[in-house]
Amino acid sequence: MSSKSLRLIVVGRLRIPFWRAAAEHYYKRISCWRAIYETIIKDGNSSLSVSQRKAMEGKNILAALEPIDIPICLDEKGKSISSQEFANFLRNYFENTTKRPCFIIGGAFGLDSSVCNIANDCLSLGNITFPHELARVIFLEQVYRAETLLRNIPYHH
């Protein structure tokens, strides 16, 4: 199994302690097998309109991307896949490219179209809406689950 890294670009800090603790729990578990880097983009100014805020956040996300990154958006309009399909999705990137998968999670209002338009892929966590803090934790759990599936470690039932 390759030990390539992955990256997560997120809008906003996890301000509530239990979200931070849950995210740290999964970062720690994932990092036993794979380097995972997080870049936090500052939330847009709350005095701006929703579209202005998303545009500002989008501009900052695009500026944070590195040449090695393969941008993959997490968005409600993205493709919904199973945990096993997600594990295979990651395996494909780790085994078939020299670049790093870079998952992008927007803020409270989602991602600006400028970010979605440059993404290689766009995935959804399902048809229901989550607070962006919970979406981050769910995504990290799915990365951990994918790693256990790829390594045949009992976790996914």
UniProtKB/Swiss-Prot annotation:
Specifically methylates the pseudouridine at position 1915 (m3Psi1915) in 23S rRNA. It comes from the Bacteria. Its EC number is 2.1.1.177. Its main location: cytoplasm. S-adenosyl-L-methionine binds at L74, G106, L125, G126, N127, I128, T129, F130. This is Ribosomal RNA large subunit methyltransferase H. Pfam families: SPOUT_MTase. Belongs to the RNA methyltransferase RlmH family. The keyword S-adenosyl-L-methionine applies. Signal peptide: none annotated. It is found in: Cytoplasm. It is an enzyme of class 2 (transferase). It catalyses: pseudouridine(1915) in 23S rRNA + S-adenosyl-L-methionine = N(3)-methylpseudouridine(1915) in 23S rRNA + S-adenosyl-L-homocysteine + H(+). GO terms for cellular component: cytoplasm. Keywords: Cytoplasm, Methyltransferase, rRNA processing, S-adenosyl-L-methionine, Transferase. One of its GO terms (molecular function) is rRNA (pseudouridine-N3-)-methyltransferase activity. Gene3D superfamilies: 3.40.1280.10. Homodimer.
